[in-house]
């Protein structure tokens, strides 16, 4: 991950741990993102979707605050 994306992921995780169920916003870097829980999965398991620099969507799958999978 590049540094901008790392900072953005950290900021999104901080919001997630404040118990906000679904967040859609634009980061200071101009990327749109959505973070949400997946009800079909375990507790503290969620997805973080965002648009990267090239306009492609990137999907990160987290358990707690650890990235366990991603799709580009």
Name the predicted role of every residue range.
Residues 18-72:
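Acidic, low-complexity, intrinsically disordered interaction modules
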